[in-house]
Amino acid sequence: MKKDRQRKVQEQLVGIIFILTLFLFLIINVIVPDREKSVQENRMLATKPKFRLSSLISGDYDEKFEAYMDDQFVGRDMWRKLKVTVDRIGGSRLENGVYIGMNGQLLEQIEVADENHLAANIKAIKSFSESQSKIPVRMMLVPDAANVLNHSLPSLAKPEDQTQMFSMVRKDLGDSVEWIDVSTELNKHKTEKIYYKTDHHWTTLGAFYAFQAAAPSLGIEGDLSGKYVSYAVSDSFNGMLASKSGVNLGEKEQIDIYVPTEEDTDLIVDYVDEGKRSTSLYDSSKLKEKDQYTVFLGGNSSLLDIRTVSTSTKRLLLVKDSFANSFIPFLTPYYREIVVVDPRYYSGTINDLMDSYRISEVLFLYSGNTFFKDNNISGVFAVE
């Protein structure tokens, strides 16, 4: 009888402590100001949604409020670290969509294409190319690390077959768009550091190998191996995949830039929508920030106009994602002007640019993962 009474008291005490702890966390969550950004994850955090009856009925409000609570929960970074530690002890090799590969190599999962968006994008690109019959239109899809560095994948990992996905896109685009294959060249160098260990981007070395493979299609002739010299600009880069997975946060990597050895490198970069100009393709101030990859062009912008002193008369329209940012410096000696558009941020249409900038060539340069989940290309390339 006495033992039963003691057990009930203990159970009640545990219940009271649990309720008080939960109540304390709720109070702290109300008092502590919301954070705008997670430095550890290198992303913006969800903000408190505005209440509207229509969004409540549709379920949109509940979804956004849940995301808000997940992002703004007090001690989130600490709990996240604890979860990663427990997962690793339990043998998990996949954390928040990131494979934890051999020798600490992090590899982002291969995205599955949204069939409707992909079909709309391909249709828009084909229609655009057919409407510009006198201008060469080229497509260069860059395979993601999980597709190339298959020797670094954890055992039993079975990512989507991105090679097959590329083949389907190439077939659907048909002859109206010239396909530039860089996958073969990157696979030849898979044992070299062509992708960062802690980030989803290729390294500048990987971009250079791709440039060498693409050069003949772009009308760039000769041996390019001795025409650029590399310089290290950072040895403390810790990329997005480390932030996303919570793994290898202490890993430090080198970022290199490649500079032409012979050509005149004078140029002007016009950040059209931002209303600013630069005489460099690099923004060294970004090396003091978390995402040091943004040293290339200062990060992503909606529209750039790069004017060079090249003797060439060619004017390139480059439609791209962030993989192109470290690729563009290889192109500048060979084009008089390069107009760079990122459809994720650009609100106009391509037809607005073709005549204004007297474009003579068009190149699409995307990583596979970005291309297969993109829902912006079809809008930007809508043929009027």
What are these regions (language model features)?
Residues 1-384:
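Extracellular glycan-modifying ectodomains
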